[in-house]
Amino acid sequence: MTIDNPSAFLKTLPTGSGVYQMQDAQGKVIYVGKARNLQKRVSSYFRRQLDSKTQAMMAQVQSIQTTITRNENEALLLEASFIKQFRPRYNVLLRDDKSYPYLYLATHQKFPRLDFYRGAKKAPGRYFGPYPNAGSVRENLALIQKLFKLRQCSESFFKNRTRPCLQYQIKRCTAPCVGYVNEQEYRRQVEDAILFFEGKNDQVIIKLTERMEVASENLVFEEAAHYRDQIRQLRRLQKQQIITGGKGNIDIIGIAESNGAIGFAILFIRSGRMIGHKPFFPNTPLGTTLQTALVEFIPQYYLSPLRNGDIPERIVTSEPLEDRLWIQRALSSGLNRKLAITDQKRAPYKQWQAMAALNAAQALSQHLAQKNTFALKLEAIQKSLALPNPIARIECFDISHTLGEATVASCVVFGEEGPIKKDYRRFNISGVTPGDDYGALRQVLTRRYVRLKEGEGILPDVLLIDGGMGQLRQAAEVLEELQVSGVILTAIAKGPGRKAGLEKLFVWGRREEIHLPADNIAFHLIQQIRDEAHRFAITAHCNRRAKRRVESTLQEIEGIGPKRRQKLLKYFGGLQELQRASIEEIARVPGVSETLAKAIYDACHQHKG
């Protein structure tokens, strides 16, 4: 509803709970809010005394749309849904586009596998986490393997083993694949690992101590020594790890502000043990208070489907939380589970609140320093290349292949805060003459910018090509054909002897080359972006090339038909294991002579690397 006459408009508003949407002249939603009393809350925006942020917003508001809800809880849940849908510029917007990783234990298997997992929890078994990042998962996975020696391999690899793999040799697995441990003993390893995940280290130590004593009484000293080492490792770990007083799952949310920016840090406490922390830097309008940011952050974060249903029993905040009970009730209702929120600074959470706030301040400081550094470098590029407009986004393309084989193109994206890895793309090139870099470049640019024109992304301010004037001409022709305008086309070409620091720069529409000093910060960033595109392209190319060669290696061996090829792969559990095998080991496969084994060995090693 338009607000030409505010007094008349406000009288039409209901006095019950609901959600309101502020819209600008184009009908775009620029703010979403919730209210226990819609009339009273919306009326507050028409007072004379407003803060600068609200004044700036209200100057753009042309209409307000309201949605009535049955109760306050529904209002909070609907507000979070609308914020996610409309991404209003005056709301605190959480940018958290990645699901959280877990450790997954396939308890339904005879010999359960423990592995890294990310995604919807559809497979049967136990999930431990979530962890703040992949590094935390891998660190804990390595620890569990060291302590309890659970297998990590896939089912196909496991079922086709005839000898232990490297994990057994480095004492990270007990090799159930070849019967070195029976099902009962392996289940004990699994049970110990589960107790460890649940924070019941003392119970694990008691069990291991009992087994050690039994082994000693039976004079099985090697086994007793193994249990002794496990106990020592667990006790050492207990001293190193930070343990809370309780045994539950708690999220401690710290918040900090600096120069108008706001940052969060969440400490993840799982089964009484801190497993890591993760920082967040949402888009916050200038003038947003810590309390407002906290109120808008919490529902967005915990109602996101990326949480995968993993909600702690308690949330603790480092700052007072307005409408704490309202948010607590609404989240409990929306998530269909009991949830407590604590914002008082008292035992046993006081030290954790201080630690979370400290982590938030430190992360925000580093984030702003990096942001300022990249913003300055982008400004330096604009000045050094004499570009007409400021730069907020650069895309760089590179082509990688080996003599025309397995050609791959990469696209990396940099912005004011550095690399934007979620926008990186790789393209498998097909249908062009092998080794035709111009053809490959035309294909990747066409595919990329057709998608951008259709609204699948943001056009860059600058397009950077790893190449010279020839590549730049191809890019200009493609963008002209697609009628893409407003993008500055640049290229970086290798200098004499391909030495770093001697590169030449080109800008489309100018005849002269540009040479920047080796110590120029703009030049350094251009090199960094080019090198990142090259790294991303060559990694994708090597993976594609290796896959092709793996698929073709056995087909090239004379005398090996489909059945024998399958028998070899099944015997060794895969082509990589076959490549590691000696001639003697290959000759042990039924139906393979020593002569054929040598031919297989030679063919495998011909394609190594």
UniProtKB/Swiss-Prot annotation:
SUPFAM superfamilies listed in its UniProt record: C-terminal UvrC-binding domain of UvrB, GIY-YIG endonuclease, RuvA domain 2-like
Function text: The UvrABC repair system catalyzes the recognition and processing of DNA lesions. UvrC both incises the 5' and 3' sides of the lesion. The N-terminal half is responsible for the 3' incision and the C-terminal half is responsible for the 5' incision.
Domain of life assignment: Bacteria
Annotated family: Belongs to the UvrC family.
Major subcellular location class: cytoplasm
Domain GIY-YIG: 15-92
Assembly behavior: Interacts with UvrB in an incision complex.
HAMAP family from the UniProt entry: UvrC
Record GO biological process: nucleotide-excision repair; SOS response
Name of the featured protein: UvrABC system protein C
Record has Zinc as a keyword: no
Assigned GO CC terms: cytoplasm; excinuclease repair complex
Domain UVR: 202-237
GO molecular function: DNA binding; excinuclease ABC activity
Keywords: Cytoplasm, DNA damage, DNA excision, DNA repair, Excision nuclease, SOS response
Compartment list: Cytoplasm
